[in-house]
């Protein structure tokens, strides 16, 4: 059954039956990720004239945050390299490291070092942020899409639960300001983005999956003319924090709350102080400048230079049109035809 035809009372079952990855699927994707991580750490930069060491590989995206949708087998792997010693280095040199990773992948394929097939895709831009490829193997029932992103290890040995040194953000803000590239280095803070969502209640992650599924359904009509999916994930967290904060809640009410927030996109101004705050004058000034921007403003909790909600009001208008239509579907209604009702928000919008 499609989501739009699913009664509100059955949304939890819909998530369980259609959106939660099963154990076999999760194991397969994990195996694929392990293959690529091993390649990056053990093989990729061996034998190069100028030794390059991989300091760590961090799993980002849905698989890192624990919000993967069933059937969508993709993984973001951020590769932190010792040769990238600044934000400027990352911007200037990531292209050469992407080329080297690609060269080694193709060599592995020719030598059949791994029992996998790499179908390397051509980069679509001059200075790509990522190398995209598809990994397939007789052991895997389906292909897994990868984005591998070389990055500068700005955080170093960061301990979960602690705020990074504000000076890291001061350097980030200076670099972004001088280049006019806000949010350009968000990959450096993948661990924080992952940490922000990772330990949330299971049911909130299920609601995020539902919202992502709705977003993907809308994308079939509008293509890439919608706001970033990450903005919808953060909007869902905000809805839960402001409207519920319970580990057990009505999924239908949560879903309706997110749809209604999309309708109010012109009033949204959302930020968190989990990893940075107003204490440091440079960071505080950057945050205030961001919060004065035209709505919607949804600041990346890991990167004060990244307003993931901004940039294109038309994209939000398209999504709002969809939200208005979806509020009339059974997934938002009680048996008597009335709306299930959104959560009462602590912060009025």
UniProtKB/Swiss-Prot annotation:
Mg(2+) binds at residues 74, 76, 147. Pfam families: NTP_transf_2, OAS1_C. It catalyses: 3 ATP = 5'-triphosphoadenylyl-(2'->5')-adenylyl-(2'->5')-adenosine + 2 diphosphate. CDD domains: NT_2-5OAS_ClassI-CCAase. One of its GO terms (cellular component) is membrane. ATP binds at residues 62, 209, 212, 229. Keywords: Antiviral defense, ATP-binding, Cytoplasm, Endoplasmic reticulum, Immunity, Innate immunity, Magnesium, Metal-binding, Microsome, Mitochondrion, Nucleotide-binding, Nucleotidyltransferase, Nucleus, RNA-binding, Secreted, Transferase. The keyword Aminoacyl-tRNA synthetase does not apply. Residues 12-59, 199-209 are annotated as: Interaction with dsRNA. One of its GO terms (molecular function) is ATP binding. GO terms for biological process: antiviral innate immune response; defense response to virus; interleukin-27-mediated signaling pathway; negative regulation of transformation of host cell by virus; negative regulation of viral genome replication; regulation of ribonuclease activity; type I interferon-mediated signaling pathway. The record marks 157 as: Interaction with dsRNA. Its EC number is 2.7.7.84. Interferon-induced, dsRNA-activated antiviral enzyme which plays a critical role in cellular innate antiviral response. In addition, it may also play a role in other cellular processes such as apoptosis, cell growth, differentiation and gene regulation. Synthesizes higher oligomers of 2'-5'-oligoadenylates (2-5A) from ATP which then bind to the inactive monomeric form of ribonuclease L (RNase L) leading to its dimerization and subsequent activation. Monomer. Homotetramer. This is 2'-5'-oligoadenylate synthase 1. It comes from Sus scrofa (Pig). The lineage of its organism: Eukaryota, Metazoa, Chordata, Craniata, Vertebrata.
């Amino acid at each position: 059954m499609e989501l739009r035809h699913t009664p509100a009372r059955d949304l939890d079952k819909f998530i369980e039956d259609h959106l939660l990855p099963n154990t076999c699927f999760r194991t397969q994707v994990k195996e694929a990720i392990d293959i690529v991580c091993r390649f990056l750490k053990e093989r990729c930069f061996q034998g190069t004239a100028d030794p390059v060491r991989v300091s760590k590989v961090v799993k980002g995206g849905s698989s890192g945050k624990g919000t993967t949708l069933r059937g969508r087998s993709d993984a973001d792997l951020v590769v932190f390299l010792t040769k990238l010693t600044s934000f400027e280095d990352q911007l200037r040199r990531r292209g050469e490291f992407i080329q080297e990773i690609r060269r080694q992948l193709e060599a592995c394929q020719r030598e059949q070092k791994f029992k996998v097939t790499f179908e390397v895709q051509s980069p679509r831009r001059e200075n790509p942020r990522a190398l995209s490829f598809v990994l397939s193997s007789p052991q895997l029932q389906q292909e897994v899409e990868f984005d591998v992103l070389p990055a500068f290890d700005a955080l170093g040995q960061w301990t979960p639960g602690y705020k990074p040194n504000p000076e890291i953000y001061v350097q980030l803000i200076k670099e972004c300001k001088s280049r006019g590239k806000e949010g350009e280095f968000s990959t450096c803070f993948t661990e924080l983005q992952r940490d922000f969502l990772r330990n949330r209640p299971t049911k909130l992650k299920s609601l995020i999956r539902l919202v992502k599924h709705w977003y993907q359904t809308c994308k079939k009509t509008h293509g890439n003319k919608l706001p970033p999916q990450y903005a919808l994930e953060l909007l869902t967290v905000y809805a839960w924090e402001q409207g519920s904060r319970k580990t057990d809640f009505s999924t239908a009410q949560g879903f309706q709350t997110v749809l209604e927030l999309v309708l109010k996109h012109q009033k949204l101004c959302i930020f968190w102080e989990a990893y940075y705050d107003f204490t440091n004058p440079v960071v505080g000034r950057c945050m205030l400048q961001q919060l004065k921007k035209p709505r919607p403003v949804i600041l990346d909790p890991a990167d004060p230079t990244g307003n993931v909600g901004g940039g294109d009001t038309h994209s939000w208008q398209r999504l709002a049109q969809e939200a208005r239509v979806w509020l009339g579907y059974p997934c938002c209604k009680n048996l008597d035809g009335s709306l299930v009702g959104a959560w009462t928000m602590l912060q009025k919008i």
